Amino acid sequence: GCYAQYVPFQAENLLKLPDAVSAEQVASLELAMCVQVSFSQLAKLAAVQGKRVGIGGLGPAGLVALQMAQAYGAAQVIAIDPVPARRELALQLGADLAVAPDDPYWSAERDDPYALDSALDCSGLKVSIEALMARTKEVVAIFGVLREDVAFGWDHWRRGLKLLGYERHNRTAAEQALQLIVQGQLDLTPLATHTLPLTRYAEGVELLRSKQAIKVRFLPWA
């Protein structure tokens, strides 16, 4: 959102919503579009369908990503986050397993039967990305905004691990994300854990900073 009642856009940059889709259902469509870009990249490498996919970081992007992994045919989706409430929400949204980063089950190295086939990091944190790289057999994609350099070394190279950056978001990705919503394969409404009038913007920001909220939906005219 733009934290305003009205925002001008070029008409060609807008998507018309189907009559059956509400504004609440697509309030986070821009985020879903961005996550879709990463899944389009993974799909080109056949890294989702039939694979054991890990999602690192269960903020809004991670909660979108785990649903997309299911929609695109992942055999199993493993959600990783240190916050219990976010792991619980991930399970409600369909993750097969939700674990803390220090969970022994999650500590499997890449040669372990429980290792991941592919993974998507949604945190941008070095510790998360490198943990995924150590536990993934084929591909690790980085969606989260990278905050510091990560180490891709000889061990990753010798076993053929692929590390993907992020491509530009685009209209096609937005249309694909919208189609997942229409088909009932992507539910964005649980991301908005709080709803406030726009006049209480500062309160909403504090809820986000303190991690009491995942996303805050502001009502422009309330």
Protein language model regions, located:
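Glycine-rich phosphate/adenylate-binding loop and adjacent beta-alpha elements
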Residues: 1-15
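Short, glycine/polar-rich helix-capping loops at beta-to-alpha or helix-loop-helix junctions
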Residues: 3, 82-89, 148-153
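Mid-domain Rossmann-like dinucleotide-binding core that forms the NAD(H)/NADP(H) cofactor-binding site
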Residues: 22-103
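Local beta-strand N-terminus motif with an aromatic residue
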Residues: 50, 95, 114-117, 137
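Short amphipathic alpha-helix with an adjacent loop that forms part of the alpha/beta core around
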Residues: 103-114
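N-terminal Rossmann-like NAD(P) cofactor-binding module of classical short-chain dehydrogenase/reductase
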Residues: 117-120, 141
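Glycine-rich phosphate-binding loop and adjacent beta-alpha segment
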Residues: 126-183, 220-222
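C-terminal hydrophobic helical "lid"/dimerization subdomain
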Residues: 171-222
